[in-house]
Amino acid sequence: MYAIISVGNRQYKVTQDQEFLTEKTGKNAGESFDAKVLLFAESSNKVHIGQPELKTARVSLKVLEDVKGDKIHAYVYKRRKNYQKAWGHRQKLQKVKVVSLSAV
């Protein structure tokens, strides 16, 4: 059984007990929450397609820990103008586990 959920402007294909990284959701480590937007669910031989989302299916998630993504470096310069600028960025992420998945 799997489902396609939307968390933080991104879509994820998830299964039971799967762990994945998502953008920071505003929840603290150890807190549980439900995926608000469930787009697709498949169980045994039944397929449930949301138009645009499913109301009956439910996916419960638990935040395991807060992590940071890889460092991204950016650099800009303008030739012959003695202008250059460099900066970096690390995205704040959360490791999330699928606790329960039901497509009723």
Swiss-Prot record:
Which residues does UniProt assign to the signal peptide? none
What are the recorded Gene Ontology BP terms? translation
Top-rank taxon, per record: Bacteria
Q: Which InterPro entries match?
A: bL21-like, bL21-like_sf, Ribosomal_bL21
Query: Organism, per UniProt?
Result: Leptospira borgpetersenii serovar Hardjo-bovis (strain JB197)
Gene Ontology, cellular component aspect: cytoplasm; ribonucleoprotein complex; ribosome
Q: How does it assemble?
A: Part of the 50S ribosomal subunit. Contacts protein L20.
Which family does the record assign? Belongs to the bacterial ribosomal protein bL21 family.
What's the name of the protein? Large ribosomal subunit protein bL21
GO terms for molecular function, please? rRNA binding; structural constituent of ribosome
